[in-house]
Amino acid sequence: MWYNLPHMKPIVVIPTYNERENVAAMAAAVLENLPAGGRLLFLDDNSPDGTGAIIDGLCARDPRIAVLHRVKKEGLGRAYVAGFARALALGATHVVEMDCDFSHDPKDIPRMLAAVADADVVVGSRYVKGGRCVGWPFRRWFVSFFGGRFIR
């Protein structure tokens, strides 16, 4: 597939807060689905459960993983903004955003990167035809779906 070209340097940005149970598995899944020049950037909001320390250990073992430790929890939106800025500073040619709770499937990364060949922006959504919420209880889906509609 074309997404594995040497010039492509995608960075996957993942904010974390109390994700110690997921962070190592998510890192492995993301790295498995990245092309050769890809990297993973975690943004930890000073998680009290030790998520940041786990990420530090992952960084020590794999140079493709980086972390931005933030002093306090400032919200998901600000975490993504900081992550996008850091990804661009690190030389990203493409930025992929994902959550650490596996609500976004890392197996979709190659498909999204391949889609960039025909578009400037690629958006994956669980609310479009063919989209889905795997493993979500009804209450979480309901709040997410109707909360998004209310905000719009």
Region spans (language model):
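Cell-envelope/extracellular polymer assembly enzymes that use nucleotide-activated donors
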Residues: 9-11, 39
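Short, well-formed alpha-helical segments that are part of the catalytic scaffolds
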Residues: 19-32
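Short beta-strand/loop segment that forms part of the nucleotide-sugar
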Residues: 27, 37-47, 68-69, 98
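Short beta-strand-to-loop acidic/aromatic patch adjacent to the donor-nucleotide binding site
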Residues: 92-103
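A conserved acidic beta->alpha catalytic loop
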Residues: 44-53, 102
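Acceptor/aglycone-binding surface of glycosyltransferases and processive sugar-polymer synthases
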Residues: 68-89, 106-152
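Donor nucleotide-sugar binding loop of glycosyltransferases
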Residues: 19-22, 47, 105
